[in-house]
Amino acid sequence: MSSLLIDLKGKELEQEEVELLSHPLVAGLILFTRNFENREQIQELIRSVRQRVKKPLLITVDQEGGRVQRFRDGFTMLPSMQAFQETLSATEQVSFAKEAGWQMAAEMIALDIDLSFAPVLDLGHECRAIGDRSFSSDVKSAVNLATAFIDGMHQAGMASTGKHFPGHGHVLADSHLETPYDDRTKEEIFSGDLQPFQQLISQNKLDAIMPAHVIYSQCDSQPASGSKYWLKEILRKKLNFQGTIFSDDLGMKGAGVMGNFVERSKKALNAGCDLLLLCNEREGVIQVLDNLKLTENQPHFMARQARLQSLFKRRVINWNDLISDQRWRLNYQKLADIQSRWLDIQAAKND
């Protein structure tokens, strides 16, 4: 049973990484800026992975836009999600959010990448880990823009991943560095932060969801990423979500309250995650591969494997064909202009 997504150290594939990626527990990998030099190099790295690892791997990346864009040189400058609401008219916002979703997904698919973990559905801009990655502080605006972005992704042939369930936007702490606590009442969370997830699930827009490494203290003592309450009771039963549940990176400090890397992995799977991310912790990956035992006899095995298969890219796009497409060319300039305008607005605020 393949459940783990791991990372690569550098810009070329090492033999040890071929062996790790070939392990039966490994379902795929996630690429980072450290793996990228230019488009030709990243395409060659991906080609090497596909050729040397003799099984289908889900290749993923965080190419959200704005400050979370792992590949920049030679790619569209994608706007921060907040930029749509702050720089465009109401009609333009939805139109260009859709184009951004399409542009991002088409470029990644043309590299032979299956999935970019997007969009961010967190409300508000106060959390330093989220900031302008969020579309809006307003539920209706966030849902409208996220719907358009996802429609663009789907049109290009990429599955969507809503994050960070049930909402990371109201904590100031960064879960990369510590475990944040959200002490608001269940009613506050359900009437606000949960709404983008709930509404997009009801519209059948979300193919996958990534929970937060945040403890919602009035609801459960575990981070959402390791919480049966959030993943089984709320996400699966109450919201009737049928798609894939990814853990956020189990190497993050925010996951530390769940124990060592093997314990974190077991807790996340038992809580309801289908696929686990473990990054920047090579020894941790080896520990998990040596000690995590998953078999076809375990509950939900077939459902989890079917969900994994649903995430692979749904079409093939040739890079040269893409960049000669008029839609891509128009978007390339317009989306960069939106981000430039947004950066100017931020710079003026800081002056």
Curated annotation (Swiss-Prot):
E.C. number(s) listed in UniProt: 3.2.1.52
Record: residues binding substrate: D62, R70, R133, K163, H164
Record localization: Cytoplasm
Record pathway: Cell wall biogenesis; peptidoglycan recycling
InterPro entries referenced in this protein's UniProt entry, alphabetically: Beta_hexosaminidase_bac, Glyco_hydro_3_AS, Glyco_hydro_3_N, Glyco_hydro_3_N_sf, Glycoside_hydrolase_SF, NagZ_Beta-hexosaminidase
Record-linked PROSITE patterns: GLYCOSYL_HYDROL_F3
Chemical reaction(s) catalysed: Hydrolysis of terminal non-reducing N-acetyl-D-hexosamine residues in N-acetyl-beta-D-hexosaminides
UniProt site positions, description: Important for catalytic activity: D174
Keywords for the protein's UniProt record, in alphabetical order: Cell cycle, Cell division, Cell shape, Cell wall biogenesis/degradation, Cytoplasm, Glycosidase, Hydrolase, Peptidoglycan synthesis
Entry-linked HAMAP family: NagZ
Subunit and partners: Monomer.
Function according to Swiss-Prot or TrEMBL: Plays a role in peptidoglycan recycling by cleaving the terminal beta-1,4-linked N-acetylglucosamine (GlcNAc) from peptide-linked peptidoglycan fragments, giving rise to free GlcNAc, anhydro-N-acetylmuramic acid and anhydro-N-acetylmuramic acid-linked peptides.
Protein name: Beta-hexosaminidase
Organism: Haemophilus influenzae (strain ATCC 51907 / DSM 11121 / KW20 / Rd)
